Swiss-Prot record:
Stored PANTHER family: IG(IMMUNOGLOBULIN) AND LRR(LEUCINE RICH REPEAT) DOMAINS (PTHR24366), TIR DOMAIN-CONTAINING PROTEIN (PTHR24366:SF161)
Subcellular location(s) per record: Secreted, Extracellular space, Extracellular matrix
Disulfide bond entries: 22-37, 303-345, 305-325
Basic residues bias spans: 348-358
Protein name: Chondroadherin
GO biological process: bone development; cartilage condensation; negative regulation of bone trabecula formation
Tissue specificity annotation: Present in femoral head and rib cartilage, as well as in tendon. Detected in bone marrow.
Family: Belongs to the small leucine-rich proteoglycan (SLRP) family. SLRP class IV subfamily.
Swiss-Prot/TrEMBL keywords: Disulfide bond, Extracellular matrix, Glycoprotein, Leucine-rich repeat, Repeat, Secreted, Signal
Pfam family, one: LRR_8
GO cellular component terms given for this protein: extracellular matrix; extracellular space
Chain's role: Promotes attachment of chondrocytes, fibroblasts, and osteoblasts. This binding is mediated (at least for chondrocytes and fibroblasts) by the integrin alpha(2)beta(1). May play an important role in the regulation of chondrocyte growth and proliferation.
């Protein structure tokens, strides 16, 4: 009996290390807590120790992530699946990963994200889905991600955002949707992420400013709309988050005009990019008070007294944007900061309250 017990113990001593061994051709560190299988020709998810916290499977070949693909590694905190030729992520693919914080799915061929794909990822904070072929976000897809902070969806093929697209992701703060095929943001599409602080929408196909969708946002500090075919910015465009907005990109949009009250409620703006557009004026309400940088080049500026606010701001700055007048003709080519066109302009007088309407 004692001999049988001894043999059993010896067998277990041999078997257990084998079960928890580092996968072939991989590198493991920290008592198998970090497993690195970068570009080793894998075609299925390897078996690793259940104590593994970081699993790097970059540059392998997993066309479909089936349900329960990672059920044996419940303690994962960081999962790297970049460049793995993934086409589809099935419902329940990450089931059981209740401690996962970082998920990298960048640079794949993902076209389909099934509803339920992110089930159980209640601690996920950083999700990278950039450089794929995702064309839509099914309603409820992100519902389990109650702690999501950063979502990178840039360089995909998303055409529109519908109501409920971000349902459940109430803590999302940074959202990147650059270089998609967006033509519209439907009203209600951003209602669930009103706490966004950084929102990048550059290099899409937005032909009009999405006022209704953006009006639900409350604390946007950085908004990027560069390289969209926008022609005008309407009244109250930034009002819902005007007390927080610090950086605004509107360069390379073919922008022709701002409505007079486009910047209503904007009080903290510090950096504005307006280069390579078709602007000839700025609205009289443009918020210069806290402005630190302003790029203006390659616009057909009309150097009349409507630019007096810009002139005053330029005179107070040591580093000045190098923009030039296009008209009137006698001032064409002169730098806005040097031209005589604005020297005689007087500040507008405030209308007496008695003269106002009653």
């Amino acid at each position: 009996m004692a001999r049988v017990l001894l043999l059993s113990l010896v067998f277990l001593a041999i078997l257990l290390p084998a079960l928890a061994a580092c996968p072939q051709n991989c590198h493991c560190h920290g008592d198998l807590q970090h497993v690195i299988c970068d570009k080793v020709g894998l075609q299925k998810i390897p078996k690793v120790s259940e104590t593994t916290k970081l699993l790097n499977l970059q540059r392998n070949n997993f066309p479909v992530l089936a349900a329960n693909s990672f059920r044996t590694v419940p303690n994962l905190v960081s999962l790297h699946l970049q460049h793995c030729n993934i086409r589809e992520v099935a419902a329940g693919a990450f089931r059981g990963l209740k401690q996962l914080i970082y998920l990298y799915l960048s640079h794949n061929d993902i076209r389909v994200l099934r509803a339920g794909a992110f089930d159980d990822l209640t601690e996920l904070t950083y999700l990278y889905l950039d450089h794929n072929k995702v064309s839509e976000l099914p309603r409820g897809l992100l519902s389990p991600l109650v702690n999501l902070f950063i979502l990178q969806l840039n360089n995909n093929k998303i055409r529109e955002l519908r109501a409920g697209a971000f349902q459940g992701a109430k803590d999302l703060r940074w959202l990147y949707l650059s270089e998609n095929a967006l033509t519209s943001l439907h009203p209600g599409s951003l209602d669930d992420v009103e706490n966004l602080a950084k929102f990048h929408l550059d290099r899409n196909q937005l032909s009009s400013y999405p006022s209704a969708a953006l009006s639900k946002l409350r604390v946007v500090e950085e908004l990027k709309l560069s390289h969209n075919p926008l022609k005008s910015i309407p009244d109250n465009a930034f009002q819902s988050f005007g007390r927080y907005l610090e950086t605004l990109w509107l360069d390379n949009t073919n922008l022709e005009k701002f409505s007079d009250a486009a910047f209503a409620g904007v009080t903290t703006l510090k950096h504005v990019h307006l280069e390579n557009n078709r602007l000839n004026q700025l609205p009289s309400t443009f918020p210069f008070d806290n402005l630190e940088t302003l790029t203006l080049t390659n616009n057909p500026w009309k150097c009349t007294c409507q630019l007096r606010g810009l002139r005053r701001w330029l005179e107070a700055k040591t580093s000045r944007p190098d923009a030039t007048c296009s008209s009137p003709a006698k001032f064409k080519g002169q730098r806005i900061r040097d031209t005589d066109a604005l020297r005689s302009c007087k500040s507008p007088t405030k209308r007496s309250k008695k003269a106002g309407r009653h």
